[in-house]
């Protein structure tokens, strides 16, 4: 598997020991804004938003030598300026939009950027806390989606399924079994049919 980590600038600033530990892993890091109060939404002016983006990137770069090329906005929310500001700050892809199962490149006024669409319908927060589905239902939904995308991939070319997990939610003792079941299904039972890719290589 190739997990990636969406990390906010405030988290890096507040918990440096955690970032030092994460820097010892091979996982790819994505910028995740400054914090969940600094939402890239509505009438936020471009200067303020640019500051959030650059500050969050610099906060992560203090702890890792890997280039921070990916972005996931807090709440997956963007302003009209977000894509351009991301390109201007050196990001090459974002995961904010939920409109496809295929990656695609688009043009901004600052250059090209790639979208790696997220699957909101399979986000653990969306399924468990908003739709109020059971943990078993969550696992089955992920497995069902994976099976269909494998079938489509064989017939029409590869598909993207990003599984977003939040440790504060699925890391609870009563949910760990569900995570293990999902990973068993994806990594072991269907492992040969899936490219477990880090985002930058897609």
Segments the model singles out, each with a brief description of its role:
Residues 2-79, 111, 117-130, 162-167:
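Metal-dependent polysaccharide deacetylase catalytic core of the NodB/CE4 family, i.e.
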Residues 21, 25, 59-63, 85-89, ...:
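Alpha-helical structural signal in soluble globular domains
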Residues 58-156:
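Active-site-adjacent pocket scaffolds in enzyme catalytic domains
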